[in-house]
Amino acid sequence: MGYESIHNDLRKRIIILAALVVVAAAVLILRLGHLTLWQGSRLARAAEERLDAEALLPTWRGSILDRTGRVLAEDVASYDIAVSYPLAGGKWASERAQEQAKREAGSAWRKMDVSRRAEAVDALLPEWKRRERSLMKLLASRSGLAESELRERLGAIAARIDRQREAVHARAIELRRQRGQSLDVAPEPIREMREMHVVARDIPATTAFELRKVGDANPGSLEVLDAARRRTPWDTAEVEVARDHLPRAIRTSVPLVMRLDGALDAIVGSVRHEAWKEDLERRPFERVGDSGSVEVDLGGYRAGSEVVGSRGLERRFEDRLRGLRGRVTRRLATEEEERLEPVPGAHVQSSIDAALQLRVQAALDPRTGLTLVQPWHTSSDALVIGDALPAAAVVLEIATGEILAAATTPRAGDAARGGRVPVSMDTAGIHRAFEAKYPPGSLVKPLVYLAAVAEGVAAEDEAIECNGHYFKERSDAARCWIYRDRYKFTTHTKSIGGPLGIEQAMARSCNIYFYTLADRLGAERLCDWYRRFGLGRLGGDVPSAAVAKALEGRGDRFATVSLGIGQGAMAVTPLEMAAAYAMVARGGSWIEPTWHKGGGRVAAVQPFSSTAVSRVLRGLEQVTSESYGTGSHMDHGGGVREPIIEAPGARWWIKTGTAEAPPLRLDRDGDGVAEKSVTDADHAWCAGVVGSAIDGMPRYAIAVIVEHGGGGGRTAGPVMAAVIRALVEEGYVGAARSPGPTRVEVR
């Protein structure tokens, strides 16, 4: 019995043991199947990655060219200093000392306890600390940074990487929590801890050569990176301004040689050297796809040092200018190398003409004198001769909508140049040609007429009497500009002996004519037409359909007729105004203005009567050709008259305008506190189209504004004349001027 019992017990144990072996084997087989069938490809990739060394190859940014092919911005060879995370975080000496101690101990290192290892490291640390201090001094000296600033930059690099590591660890902990795994895990190193990080840019080649040797002698400390910096050749240029056609008070046969700094800066823009959150979200370097795999965009952004267009054309065309990185993958087991070459960014040809831009900027510059308060202006008495007035001008090609020039004043740094600035310079960073908006005043009058004819509420030959004030019961509201005490309350009808047709109404800028058409159209239809002309599309404001309908609903006729002369609840940018006049010249086709050569496209067509357009152009021409035109001439007394616009070889069709402006806050001492608020300083406008006298075809649209300049004809008119002459000088209209007294030179 005893034997059988022992035998049975042994057999049971063997069976149990065998069962356990079978179960264990089954578990292993299932696990193996899971790893090979379900996770095999992922694990294989991971294993292969451990056998691969991968490096990214830098790309370079495309150039920005002007419409003639001149380079406005380009990448040129440069060198950057990059440091390791240990050096940035003050751990480089400790790591190097530990590596040396480990190397010197050899196989004995594994047998040493913690205290003996620490002793070995501490013995070597002073020398590595000395080398670290020497590195810091050398880096500060060669980078041109104060040592304190260098340490501040290094600290910022280390802190950024630490934050990234903490964020990665937090995500890993959350994932482990969801899976029910242990949370007692240390943070893993991240890629940025193994990479180099730029601390100084654009160092000389000799310095780069020196620091490369230093980096080789101090492994894991610094590297010199082949980089590129953005060169903008037109940052500084000289323009020779002919002054023989300026108004008599400042006219001279002696040209003015003017140095212009940054005349294209606000248009071309700039780049920054750091990727922001918005960049990382819009186009990340790595993105987890729907399948869970990591997808790499070699043109995407990575946290830290990146070249990114931050404003102007650099930002507008960022995705075209930005190239694709290359990649080199080296298989460590076989020494095979796979290489994907970088793809450079595309060149972008802008619509801007650099030389024309400089000429237009020079016309606005206070040193030329046209944007200084002058004796011939009709500006507020609170302004004095020599005060510098903010202004803007824009030129676009009618056929394409391409913007040829867009100038603004003041610009940053202009405060001490060419005239007293009576207002705050806080707005110097605004490009007034397309970022500021103003009531358009009388510039909308051609648009109102064309809209009225298109809607059938006015005939092409509509004639309307000017009785001085639109509402019979109110002689103090909705008046014509001529119905004033200083003009003895006369009217245009009295002046000509009858009603005005559109040509006379345009040339004389009769308010009553356009009050009438606006009243017939109603606010809703009028505002709809303004939007068709592009007003309110590019930064301006035009009452919405709901707001305009509400005006009609409450019977607010004064608000409606005010819109008919560009006053009230509307404001436009100079660019919008130029685009609207271009649409008039095209006969009803609206093309959105573009900064890209070849980028203009017809967006909408509102075909106007060719007769109506011809009448508008005749009226605009009479603004300067007829003695009664608001842009015709300036009287100097004694029967001496001076034409406002003279530009041999050109033909122009323009409209002047005076628009009510918000109070002007004078700050003459520049302390940021206004000493006086002026309410009678209107804005001066002038807009129109220009072509060659030879064929008489409108080819370019122009809009000019001088803030608080008073009358449009006497203040904005001479600026318009200078812009037209710039087009002549650059060969756009008339005969191209031969090289001679007027020139543009890049410095």
Predicted regions and their residues:
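Ordered, soluble secondary-structure elements with a strong preference for glycine-centered loop motifs
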Residues: 307, 710-714
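Beta-lactam-recognizing serine transpeptidase/beta-lactamase-like catalytic domain environment
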Residues: 324-347, 352, 356, 378-442, ...
